[in-house]
Amino acid sequence: MIGRSPGSLVETAEAAQRRRRRRAWPPALLVGSALVLVTFLALPVGVLLLRAIQPDAVASLALPVAAEALRLSIVTTLISLAVIIVGGTPLAYLLARYEFRGRAVLDAIVDLPVVLPPVVAGVALLLVFGRRGLLGEPLADAGLTVVFTTAAVVLAQVFVASPFYVRALKVGFAAVPRELESAALTDGADQVQAFLRITVPIAFPSFVEGVVLAWARALGEFGATIVFAGSLAGRTRTLPLAIFAALERDLDAAVALSAVLTAVAAVMFLVVRTVSRGRF
């Protein structure tokens, strides 16, 4: 065996140390960059929550305006959610289990509200349901007005939130093995029984995820609502619009209402994470 000289051993050790330094540098850079972004994301929310627990902010939640906005948000989002479930469930099943001409186009239409700016969505709804819109004019002739009413709030929420429900439930339906449904039919179950006994239990976590995501999106809707429904206290001023209105006259109320939405968003996030990890 040929031994190495002390000089070569020193050079080898120095080279190994340099390699370790090179390997150690990228993780340090990654951690530093990540820390900057995480701080940027967490700091505003933390300051908001700290400000929200101040006595003046807490007291503002008892104001009639705050209670009215909260009530309107809950009522409209629950109605919107019911509409989304009734219309979105068969649509999600259709997209997940059937191949047909035009399926890609239908899929793209479902995704469109996600990428469409909310203000643009409001303008589009206005062109359809406004007093001189495609459907709004004949409705107005029949004595029915949609724009700047609570119904307009619901329509705006349904428009922007539907894709979140359909997308989540589509994934759940697609994950159901067809063999299980076929076995249920072979055992004597009809289509409805197979759907209720096999498909629904397997897709249920995706259903919960879709409901939570759609409800959270509807609850936070602002742009389409203010364009299409306006900001009328007691009629169309939901929580996001009440926050915007309060910024001009009562910062404490805006902070408190913002904290309420933040808390709801946090709960919704935890529910989605729990369901997605299979711990429901």
What are these regions (language model features)?
Residues 213, 227-231:
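Short, glycine/charged-rich beta-strand-loop motifs at protein surfaces that mediate ligand recognition
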Residues 1-24:
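Short, Lys/Arg-rich, polar N-terminal cytosolic tail immediately upstream
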Residues 101, 179, 189-191:
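Short coil/turn motifs that cap or connect alpha-helices
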Residues 232-246:
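Short hydrophobic, aromatic-rich alpha-helical segments embedded in or entering the lipid bilayer
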Residues 21-55, 64-174, 198, 202-223, ...:
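Membrane-water interface segments at the C-terminal ends of transmembrane alpha-helices
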Residues 184:
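The alpha-helix within a helix-turn-helix
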Residues 187-189, 201:
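Glycine/proline-centered hinge or cleavage motifs at structural transition points of membrane proteins
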